């Protein structure tokens, strides 16, 4: 019997759309049943179809007032600010990918479970999560009986930890120093603009230099 994992995505931006494309390309038994994003549905469909980094999605993408269809698969689109108001149970979502970057505290991410989700995977470092997992490093530590709010760690950690694990297991690491080259994020500006961190107010001379 083939078990299909039904997934909802909260935050259909860079990470959310990348997850969608990865799930589609993997041919895994994953069904995206709904996404939640405050952006209008026409724009979401367009951004999913046309990506300046990954190129065009090689399937037709259409939409109506409350759903997007990719090829023959249709998923609901919600526009809720409060995770607790999302009706994940009504669309059968077992797992929610929390990729807004906003709800990284376990108490906030757990609000998805109010609407019916059984597990939440946060696509960033989190606070008070049940476990932080990096595939290929410590994913064997996952315990489905007690790990419901899961952090997938940071992009830097996912790049560094697998390599460090191999080096440490085979040769040993006493101490280390790393430099990361990071692309601009949604939080960084390319014009002078107010920012909660004063270093981040001034276009490319700002916080990008101090990110890591």
Protein language model regions, located:
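N-terminal Rossmann-like NAD(P) cofactor-binding subdomain of oxidoreductases
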Residues: 2-203
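Short, intrinsically disordered, charge-balanced linker/junction segments flanking boundaries
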Residues: 206-212
């Amino acid at each position: 019997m083939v078990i299909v994992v039904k997934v909802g995505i909260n935050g259909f931006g860079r990470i959310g759309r990348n997850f969608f494309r990865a799930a589609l390309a993997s041919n895994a038994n994953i069904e995206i049943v709904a996404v939640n994003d405050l952006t209008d549905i026409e724009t979401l469909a367009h951004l999913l179809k046309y990506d300046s980094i990954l190129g065009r999605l090689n399937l037709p993408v259409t939409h109506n007032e409350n759903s997007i269809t990719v090829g023959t698969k249709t998923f609901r689109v919600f526009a809720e600010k409060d995770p607790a108001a999302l009706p994940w149970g009504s669309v059968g979502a077992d797992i929610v990918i929390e990729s807004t970057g906003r709800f990284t505290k376990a108490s906030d991410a757990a609000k998805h479970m109010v609407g019916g989700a059984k597990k939440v995977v946060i696509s960033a470092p989190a606070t008070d999560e049940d476990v932080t997992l990096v595939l290929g490093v410590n994913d064997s530590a996952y315990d489905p009986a007690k790990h419901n709010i899961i952090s997938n760690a940071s992009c830097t950690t996912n790049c560094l930890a697998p390599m460090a694990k191999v080096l440490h297991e085979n040769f040993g690491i006493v101490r280390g120093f790393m430099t990361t080259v990071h692309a601009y994020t949604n939080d960084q500006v390319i014009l002078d603009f107010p920012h909660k961190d004063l270093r981040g107010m001034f276009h490319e001379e700002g916080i990008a230099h101090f990110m890591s």
